[in-house]
A protein has these predicted regions:
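Sec-dependent signal peptide recognition
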Residues: 1-7
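N-terminal signal peptide c-region/cleavage motif recognized by signal peptidases
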Residues: 13-14
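N-proximal helix/coil linker or "cap" segments that precede and/or mark the start of modular domains
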Residues: 19-32, 167
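Thiol-based oxidoreductase modules, predominantly thioredoxin-like and allied folds used
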Residues: 31-35, 75-107
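A short beta-strand-turn-helix
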Residues: 34-53, 82
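Short active-site neighborhood of thiol/selenol oxidoreductases, capturing the structured segment around
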Residues: 49-63, 88
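Conserved redox-active cysteine motifs that mediate thiol-disulfide chemistry
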Residues: 59-73
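Non-catalytic, surface beta->alpha helical segment in thiol-disulfide oxidoreductase systems
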Residues: 114-169
Length: 187
């Protein structure tokens, strides 16, 4: 009987750490917005909320997306940053839902991803406050984060974006190194 309860406890605790996955195979999170994927409208809404538009490109079965959703995004500081600072729109690398780019071009997700030359998932695209009407998302991006990174790189990038570090003189890599030094993580 003890073994049965132990097994049930293990199953419940291990499944609690797993991120939810939708019918399309993409991870679900309460900080991902359901929109019409018109990036101009999403950007305007993000700005109205005082947030940065973050476009995250993912795909079914992506082990690096899973790593981010299960190990990195749930970290309290990162989860708080996602809720407080970002308006997140998810794009399916192989999806068929129409996406309208900043220049007015409308394509299915998979074709828009190809237009952006996005090869890897996850891919996070962070938009600045001002985006030209003739721009593409990747052409106007304040920063692009391809792939899965650990806690400190992700947190420091989120913070650098939130303080609009991309508008200043300190590139992200120097900011990141300084933050690691100030936290006593590296010398």
């Amino acid at each position: 009987m003890f073994r049965l309860f132990a097994l049930i406890a293990i199953l419940f605790t291990s499944s609690a750490a797993l991120a939810d996955v939708g019918d399309d195979g993409l991870h679900e999170a309460d900080w991902i917005r359901e929109t019409f994927k018109d990036l101009r409208e999403d950007h305007a809404e993000a700005e109205a909320e005082g947030k940065t538009l973050m476009i995250i490109v993912e795909q079914r079965g992506c082990i690096y997306c899973t790593k981010m959703h299960e190990d990195i995004f749930p970290i309290p500081e990162i989860n708080a940053a996602l809720h407080d600072n970002f308006f997140v729109v998810q794009i399916n690398m192989f999806g068929d839902v129409d996406v309208t780019d900043f220049d007015g071009t409308t394509l299915p997700e998979k074709d828009m991803v190809r237009r952006w030359n996005a090869l890897f998932t996850p891919l996070m695209i962070f938009m600045p406050s001002d985006v030209a009407e003739d721009a593409t998302a990747t052409g106007a991006a304040a920063a692009v984060m391809p792939g899965a990174f650990g806690k400190w790189t992700t947190l420091n990038l989120f913070n650098w974006i939130a303080i609009k570090g991309y508008e200043g003189d300190e590139p992200f890599q120097r900011y990141h190194a300084r933050m690691l030094q100030e936290a006593g993580i590296v010398e």
